[in-house]
């Protein structure tokens, strides 16, 4: 079921792949390109999201909604998805508004599955 949500998400222009990883770093579902090591990305995304959550709490920002890593060749966006974290890999030049809305809708569907 989660895989269907990810496949639909991946149809969004600019999205190269997506996955859901547990807060413990274990991969729950993945629709990433074959060249990407899902287990490694999952573990690192979980650690990055956890650090961002702690930072947001420490500086009084409230609940973390999203974190983004931006590089020369693309972006990695992460949002809370209940028991997991929705991770999306994108091209460098994307419509971030569209990506964020699409991710939020997908995360809500995923939350309902846990």
Curated annotation (Swiss-Prot):
Pfam family for this entry, one: Robl_LC7
Gene3D superfamilies membership: Dynein light chain 2a, cytoplasmic
GO biological process: one example: positive regulation of TOR signaling
Top-level taxon of origin: Archaea
Gene Ontology molecular function terms on file: guanyl-nucleotide exchange factor activity; molecular adaptor activity
PANTHER family per record: LATE ENDOSOMAL/LYSOSOMAL MP1 INTERACTING PROTEIN (PTHR13323)
Family that this chain belongs to: To M.jannaschii MJ0310 and MJ0714.
Protein name in the entry: Uncharacterized protein MJ1340
Species per Swiss-Prot/TrEMBL record: Methanocaldococcus jannaschii (strain ATCC 43067 / DSM 2661 / JAL-1 / JCM 10045 / NBRC 100440) (Methanococcus jannaschii)
């Amino acid at each position: 079921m989660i895989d269907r949500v990810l496949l639909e998400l991946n149809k969004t222009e600019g999205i190269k792949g997506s996955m859901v990883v547990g807060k413990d770093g274990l991969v729950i579902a993945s629709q990433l390109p074959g060249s990407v090591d899902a287990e490694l990305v999952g573990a690192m995304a979980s650690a990055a999201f956890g650090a961002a959550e702690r930072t947001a709490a420490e500086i009084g920002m409230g609940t973390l909604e999203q974190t983004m890593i931006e590089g020369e060749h693309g972006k990695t966006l992460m949002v809370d998805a209940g028991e997991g974290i929705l991770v999306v890999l994108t091209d460098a030049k994307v419509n971030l508004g569209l990506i964020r809305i699409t991710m939020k809708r997908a995360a809500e569907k995923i939350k309902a599955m846990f």
